[in-house]
């Protein structure tokens, strides 16, 4: 996303929120050595740092700026992102502060008529909602505070040059008062759409630029609107173009107006012009002031590859999508979730470079899925030709009275976890399963109680390989099954009856979602994707599936 007049104090003469800043991290001149360097302390870089800490891998995070992000960044955090953040220890704070929502509404026409509403969480009995709205600076702050004990973050440290060698990467890092050399075994570029690392390496970032301009106004107000996503086609208050409204914490609301392609960009962000648009949307009775105003266009791009020997790209540094669908930051957090456990195993000697190639395979596939959805959304929302405009109007016109047409109304296909069914790490089924969940999918949460107070399946998994074992009085005892598992795989026994040696599926929801019978066994990856499943525990097959899920089988003779 390309923004102009991004700062409110530049564009409109004032800013209403003080940005949290950090002093430059003291460093020693000379040469230093660390296993992993992460460039960028945004949500993706910070999530990687938190995950590496859990994995026992030392890392340093280099951040060229002096504090938290500001302005119109990510606000919509999807259920899968919340599940990842829960494992990393920050989701409770996100839920406490954020605005929970599951419902979206689509309006159209001169009367702003409601076309239809949709529930983004049709499958209930899960720990987290479909989305939580929370300003990006809060998410960053929660990660920074979680990492505060021996923090790996080096503030105001800029990468000036790099050289990739056979045994790692040499960086020249500029700090406010000095310059130093830093050697790492692995370099992760999580430094955003204008990635310094990508530029220094001269790597591609091919894609498409969209010409339409959009105005974001984050306004502070006490409004009577519900906590839901509200989207307008042909908005009467926005000259017949699209508009979007979202609630954020602190009585802040995100208002997004399509302006078109050929506009006076300087005039668009003048206070009187912004106020005219906001007032037309809200009506005359609601008082408001501005937290942030920005004008943006956006791009859909990705690198050809995300893994370049010992340099790995994640988040916006690797792929860039439009904001419609909230697929940017959420996709980046899934990058981090996919990468951290794989690189940790390579560093510990438990896997080889083939496992990192699977990060490239799986996350390029996910990026293409996000790019496709983002591009389709943008094309539908911003028709470029009379034919495209006619199609949009016809579909929108049918949607109110004809449910079949609603599937074709595209106001942003919202972020969902990417499945990895075709991944080389996934073992195909040998047995019949009726559940919608398939190998390669992210595990679907469900109630699961244990004596230690955990109440949900995903709370039991953590960032490790787990063998989920559904049992009853007639199946082998948990201790017997555990003794047959490969090293590094934890057993999670589940029973419909209350037992001291198993977690309790009291409602039966978990068993139903996994089409589990007594004996059903599932191997789950550290990023909580289902790697393989069987109708009975089979030690040789479990071992083979583990070798496949860690890419070891790819290099075995």
Question: Model segments located where?
Answer:
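Helical substrate-recognition/capping region of FAD-dependent monooxygenase/halogenase enzymes
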Residues: 2-35, 39, 54-55, 109-111, ...
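Active-site-adjacent segment of FAD-dependent monooxygenases/related oxidoreductases
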Residues: 70-146
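Conserved FAD-binding catalytic core of PHBH/FMO-like flavoproteins
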Residues: 96, 105, 144-145, 166-170, ...
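N-terminal Rossmann-fold NAD(P) dinucleotide-binding loop
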Residues: 45-46
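Glycine-rich FAD pyrophosphate-binding loop
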Residues: 53-73
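A conserved short coil-to-beta-strand element within the FAD-binding core of flavoproteins
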Residues: 155-169
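FAD/FMN-dependent oxidoreductases across multiple families
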Residues: 11-18, 249-251, 266-331, 351, ...
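Core beta-strand elements of the Rossmann-like FAD/NAD(P) dinucleotide-binding domain
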Residues: 32-34, 177-186
């Amino acid at each position: 996303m390309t923004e102009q007049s991004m700062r409110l104090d530049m564009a409109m003469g004032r800013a209403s929120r003080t940005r949290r800043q950090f002093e430059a991290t003291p460093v020693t001149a000379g040469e230093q050595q660390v296993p992993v360097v992460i460039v960028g302390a945004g949500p993706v870089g910070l999530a990687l740092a938190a995950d590496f800490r859990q994995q026992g891998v030392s890392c340093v995070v280099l951040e060229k700026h002096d504090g938290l992000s500001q302005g119109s960044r990510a606000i919509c955090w999807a259920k899968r992102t919340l599940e990842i953040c829960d494992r990393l220890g920050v989701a409770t704070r996100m839920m406490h502060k954020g605005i929970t929502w599951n419902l979206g509404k689509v309006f159209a026409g001169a009367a702003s008529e409601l076309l239809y509403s949709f529930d983004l969480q049709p499958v209930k009995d899960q720990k987290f909602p479909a989305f939580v709205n929370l300003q990006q600076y809060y998410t960053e702050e929660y990660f920074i505070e979680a990492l505060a004990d021996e923090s790996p973050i080096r503030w105001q440290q800029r990468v000036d040059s790099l050289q990739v060698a056979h045994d790692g990467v040499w960086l020249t890092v500029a700090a406010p008062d000095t310059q130093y050399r830093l050697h790492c075994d692995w370099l992760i570029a999580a430094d955003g759409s204008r990635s310094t690392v990508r530029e220094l390496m001269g790597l591609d970032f091919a894609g498409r630029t969209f010409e339409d301009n959009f105005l974001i106004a984050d306004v502070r107000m006490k409004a009577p609107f519900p906590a839901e996503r509200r989207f307008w086609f042909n908005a009467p208050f926005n000259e017949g173009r699209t508009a979007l409204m979202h609630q954020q914490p602190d009585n802040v609301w995100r208002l997004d107006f399509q302006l078109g392609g050929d506009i006076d960009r300087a005039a668009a962000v003048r206070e009187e012009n912004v106020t005219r648009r906001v007032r037309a949307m809200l009506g005359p009775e609601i008082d408001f002031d501005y937290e942030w105003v920005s004008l943006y266009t956006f791009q859909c791009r990705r690198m050809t590859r995300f893994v370049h020997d010992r340099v790995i790209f994640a988040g916006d540094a690797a792929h860039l999508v439009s904001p419609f669908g909230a697929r940017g930051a959420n996709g980046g957090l899934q990058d981090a979730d996919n990468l951290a456990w794989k690189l940790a195993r390579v560093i510990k000697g438990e896997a080889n470079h083939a496992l990192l190639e699977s990060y490239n395979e799986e996350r390029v596939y996910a990026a293409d899925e996000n790019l496709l959805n983002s591009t389709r959304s943008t094309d539908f929302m911003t028709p470029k030709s009379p034919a495209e405009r006619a199609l949009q109007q016809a579909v929108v016109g049918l949607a109110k009275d004809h449910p079949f047409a609603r599937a074709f109304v595209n106001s942003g296909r919202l972020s969902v976890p990417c499945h990895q069914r075709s991944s080389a790490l996934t073992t195909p089924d040998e047995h019949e399963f009726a559940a919608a969940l398939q190998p390669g999918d992210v595990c679907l949460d469900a109630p699961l109680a244990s004596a230690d107070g955990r109440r949900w399946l995903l709370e039991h998994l953590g960032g490790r390989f787990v063998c989920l074992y559904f049992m009853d009085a007639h199946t082998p005892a948990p201790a017997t099954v555990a003794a047959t598992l490969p090293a590094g795989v934890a057993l999670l026994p589940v029973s419909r009856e209350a037992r001291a040696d198993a977690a309790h599926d009291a409602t039966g929801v978990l068993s139903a979602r996994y089409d589990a019978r007594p004996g059903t066994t599932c191997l789950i990856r550290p990023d909580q994707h289902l790697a393989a499943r069987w109708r009975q525990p089979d030690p040789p097959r479990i071992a083979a599936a583990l070798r496949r899920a860690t890419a070891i089988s790819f290099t075995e003779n």
